[in-house]
Amino acid sequence: MTKTSLRYLILCLALFPLSARAQDGDVQSKQYDDGGVYEGTFKEGVQHGTGTYTLPNGYKYSGEWFEGEIKGEGVAHFPNGSVYEGNFSKGKPDGLGKITFADGGTYEGEWQAGAIMGQGIALYANGVRYEGSFRNAKHHGKGVMQSPGGYEYKGDWVDGVKQGIGTITYPDGAVYDGDIIDGTRSGTGTLTMPDGLTYVGLWKDGQIDGVGTLTQPNGDTYEGDLVAGQRHGTGRVTYANGDTYEGAFKDDRRDGQGTFTGTDGYIYTGSWVAGQIEGEGQVTYPDGSVYKGTFRNDLANGKGKITYPDGSTYDGQWVDGIIEGDGRATYPNGVVYEGSFKN
C-alpha cells in the first residue's frame, strides 16, 4: 500500500463518523427530485425529529417527523393560502388541529386522514359560526349554527344539510321546534311567535301545510286543515269569547258549509262565502226565533221563513234582514195576512 493510499484511507475513516453524526441529529439540508427542499434532522438517512419541508408550488411544512414521515405536531402552509397548525399522521392533518383559510374563516377540532372529521368549531368568513359534528368538512350529525343576524339552528345535519329534528330561533324571536327535511320545515313541528301566536301540526316545504292547531294571540284557536299557512279545508274555531265555528274554510276564511254557535244562543248552519253568511241556511236567534231561507252579507235576503217563539210565522221576501216584499204572515190568534210588506 502506498503512502498516498494510506493517507486516503485514514482521511475516509476520519470523515465517516462526522457524516453519521450529522445524519442522526444535526440539522442538514437536502433537495429532492420533485424540487422539494428539507432542512432539519435525519435518522438513518431519512427525515426524523424536526424539520421544514418546502415545495416549489408554495407548500411548506415545519414540525415533527418520524422515520421519513410527517408525523406529530407541526404547521403547514398550503398553496391556496390556508394555514394548518396541529397534529399530523402520514403527512396529513390527523387528530386535533386548526386551519385558517385564505378568506379568514377558521376550523378548529378533529381531523382524520387530512379531512375535517369529528367534533369541531368553524367560523366562516361571512360571520356564521358552527359548533358540532363534521364529516368530510360538512356539518354532519348534531350541531349548532349561528348567524350574525340572530338566526340559530340547533339539531341534526346530513352532509351539510339540515335534516332530522331541530330547533330554529329566528331574529325576531320566533322559535320552530320539529322536523326538518332538506333544510326546510317539513313534517311535524311547533312554531311559537313573539306575539303569542302558536302553531302545532304539519309542515311542508317550509310552510304550515296539513292538519294542525293554530292559536292566535287573542286566544282564538283553530283546529283543522291548513294549506300554505292558511286555513283551508275543514276545521273548527273556538273563539276567545266561547263562540265556535265548525265547517269549511277557503283562503283562511269561512267558505262552504258550516255551523256558527254563539254563547248567546245564536246558531247558524248553512252556506258561507268569503267569510260571510251567504246562500241557503238556517239560523236560530237567541230569543228562540228560527229563520230558514236565503242570506246575503250575513243577513236574511231573498226568500225565507221565520217562526217566532209565540208560534207566529212569516214566509216571503226579505231585504237586508228586514221583511219586505210579498209574503204570508200567520199570527197566534189565527189571523193570516198575505200580501205586500215594507219594513
Where would I find each of the regions flagged by the language model?
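Bacterial N-terminal signal peptides that target proteins for export
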Residues: 1-9
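Bacterial N-terminal signal peptides
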Residues: 8-17
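Sec/Tat signal peptide C-region and signal peptidase I cleavage site
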Residues: 18-22
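Short N-terminal segments immediately surrounding and downstream of signal-peptide cleavage
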Residues: 23-39
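Conserved anchor residues at repeat-unit boundaries in beta-strand-based tandem repeats, strongest
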Residues: 37-48, 60-71, 83-93, 106-117, ...
